[in-house]
UniProtKB/Swiss-Prot annotation:
NCBIfam families documented for this protein: atpA, PRK13343.1
Protein name: ATP synthase subunit alpha
InterPro entries: ATP_synth_asu-like_sf (IPR023366), ATP_synth_asu_C (IPR000793), ATP_synth_asu_C_sf (IPR038376), ATP_synth_F1_a_nt-bd_dom (IPR033732), ATP_synth_F1_asu (IPR005294), ATPase_a/bsu_AS (IPR020003), ATPase_F1/V1/A1_a/bsu_N (IPR004100), ATPase_F1/V1/A1_a/bsu_N_sf (IPR036121)
Organism, as annotated: Shewanella sp. (strain W3-18-1)
The gene coding this protein: atpA
Subunit architecture: F-type ATPases have 2 components, CF(1) - the catalytic core - and CF(0) - the membrane proton channel. CF(1) has five subunits: alpha(3), beta(3), gamma(1), delta(1), epsilon(1). CF(0) has three main subunits: a(1), b(2) and c(9-12). The alpha and beta chains form an alternating ring which encloses part of the gamma chain. CF(1) is attached to CF(0) by a central stalk formed by the gamma and epsilon chains, while a peripheral stalk is formed by the delta and b chains.
Keywords associated with the record: ATP synthesis, ATP-binding, Cell inner membrane, Cell membrane, CF(1), Hydrogen ion transport, Ion transport, Membrane, Nucleotide-binding, Translocase, Transport
Organism domain of life: Bacteria
Required for activity (site feature) positions: S373
Cited function: Produces ATP from ADP in the presence of a proton gradient across the membrane. The alpha chain is a regulatory subunit.
């Protein structure tokens, strides 16, 4: 079959008429300077604050300094091959990360890319890393507990769903251990967890992931990693990425817990970026907006009301409140809580758990200082039975500390003072707890009941731990129904008190430890 010239020209004309040009207008600029992960770009007239700038090699930078004739941007990744004269483009997009249930059980980097070798992630969409926190009207008061599994915390410094509770202390005082145990304790509670590791060694993070897996908590947890060897920009943005992943559950009427380990390293990364961008330094060389750096992050942790959830899900979820509980960690230097970053975060959060080196070294673990540790809103969320029983624990410990210091100077003590000291030292011993061994509400209740009702008086100090272990074993076997009831309801009444007393009386009379 032969086509004549007329048919060929008609065919070409038809194809030309059908051809659609898809044009995209994008602003292009030129790199004029590169130094330490910071690039200065000329020619990007319409760039937004925080916008992603496309670099060669499928990399991005984030615009942080918008100046009269140039833009200062921080590179998200390696920058060694970038040089003066390289062309870059605006994207019109703010940085987003993948969110959804597919991230549970996975280890990802700041950008939400998997780094655990388990293949691609099945996400439910994307969310911006910078989100405005829910307003006052959209929030609900904190009234449900987050059980950490630690007697010392759940009894004296209770944490509620939607609260921000700071864990603060020097290095090697058990801050990460406490946060990891809190995550492990949520594996059957329905609370989804996010662990954000900032500026840590890769080996340390690998160990944390392994421990979570061993205790069956990884399937319920998202691990976001920005190691010490990664760019300062990734360390600075990691907490915001993790927060967006946690907000996915909060906004759908579920409960989530996020651990930032730790925000001191994030502040250092932000200080590095700010100094390289030539922003004026302030106290301790931190930039002027370092308070806002943490406040805008921690304000996103909240308990939102039913109206907010219904509005967000467009009616798909009704009658449910959502919460995001934050446990930020701050590392102090030589116990100095009055330094710049610690005081900032203390003023933002709803309380703090202060861990002391001296207590840790003396064998008291968790090394919680009950004197300056406080929970400002958790009391309303505390489980009924723990709240009722633990009232005297904090007082006993505070009085014991005071009397112990005083008794060093006094040669003879009256019987009442000696009894208080004996009680205080036994309660202190009872508060000790091993790592990776979180306790149920019922187990905590039995231990605290024994201390409050004077059952420890006749127990040798060095045998308090053995007494507790034997008591819990006895109660779990002989009073399993009571333990189950306490775990399920958390109630405390005369009937439960009578059964606890009967169980303890029988244990003391018949058992050895």
């Amino acid at each position: 079959m032969q086509l004549n010239s007329t048919e060929i020209s008609d065919l070409i004309k038809q194809r030309i008429e059908q051809f659609e040009v898809v044009s995209e207008s994008r602003n292009e600029g030129t790199i004029v300077a590169v130094s330490d992960g910071i690039i200065r770009i000329h020619g990007l007239a319409d760039v937004m604050q925080g916008e992603m700038i496309e670099l060669p090699g499928n990399r991005f930078a984030i615009a942080l300094n918008l100046e009269r004739d140039s833009v200062g941007a921080v590179v998200m990744g390696p920058y060694a091959d970038l040089a003066e004269g390289v062309k870059v483009k605006t994207t019109g997009r703010i940085l987003e990360v993948p969110v959804g249930r597919g991230l549970l059980g996975r280890v990802v980097n700041t950008l939400g890319e998997p780094i655990d070798g388990k293949g691609p992630i099945d996400n439910d969409g994307f969310s911006p890393v910078e989100v405005i926190a829910p307003g006052v009207i959209e929030r609900q008061s904190v009234s449900q507990p987050v059980q950490t599994g630690y007697k010392a915390v759940d009894a004296m410094i209770p944490i509620g769903r939607g609260q921000r509770e700071l864990i603060i202390g020097d290095r090697q005082t058990g801050k990460t251990a406490m946060a990891i145990d809190a995550i492990i304790n949520q594996k059957d509670s329905g609370i989804k967890c996010v662990y954000v590791a900032i500026g840590q060694k890769a080996s340390t993070i690998a160990n944390v992931v392994r421990k979570l897996e061993e205790h069956g908590a990884l399937a319920n947890t998202i691990v976001v990693v920005a190691t010490a060897s990664e760019a300062a920009a990734l360390q600075f943005l990691a907490p915001y990425s993790g927060c967006s992943m946690g907000e996915y559950f909060r906004d759908r009427g579920e409960d989530a817990l996020i651990v930032y380990d730790d925000l001191s390293k994030q502040a250092v990364a932000y200080r590095q970026i700010s100094l390289l961008l030539k922003r004026p330094p302030g106290r301790e060389a931190y930039p002027g907006d370092v308070f806002y750096l943490h406040s805008r992050l921690l304000e996103r942790a909240s308990r939102v009301n039913e109206i907010y959830v219904e509005k967000f899900t467009k009616g798909a979820v009704t009658g449910k409140t959502g919460s995001l509980t934050a446990l930020p960690i701050i590392e102090t230097q030589a116990g100095d809580v009055s330094a710049f970053v610690p005081t900032n975060v203390i003023s933002i959060t709803d309380g703090q758990i202060f861990l002391e080196t001296d207590l840790f070294n003396s064998g008291l673990r968790p090394a919680v200082n009950p004197g300056i540790s406080v929970s400002r809103v958790g009391g309303a969320a505390q489980t009924k039975i723990i709240k009722k029983l633990s009232g005297g624990i904090r007082t006993a410990l505070a009085q014991y500390r005071e009397l112990a210091a005083f008794s060093q100077f006094a040669s003879d003590l009256d019987d009442a003072t000696r009894a208080q000291l004996e009680h205080g030292v036994r309660v202190t011993e009872l508060m000790k707890q091993k790592q990776y061994a979180p306790m149920s509400v019922a187990a905590q209740s039995v231990s605290i009941f024994a201390a409050e009702k004077g059952y420890l008086k006749s127990v040798e100090l060095k045998k308090v731990g053995d007494f507790e272990a034997a008591l819990l074993s006895f109660m779990n076997s002989e009073h399993a129904a009571l333990m189950k009831l306490i775990n399920e309801t958390g109630d405390y009444n005369a009937e439960i008190e009578a059964e606890l007393k009967a169980g303890l009386d029988k244990f003391v009379a018949t058992q050895t430890w």
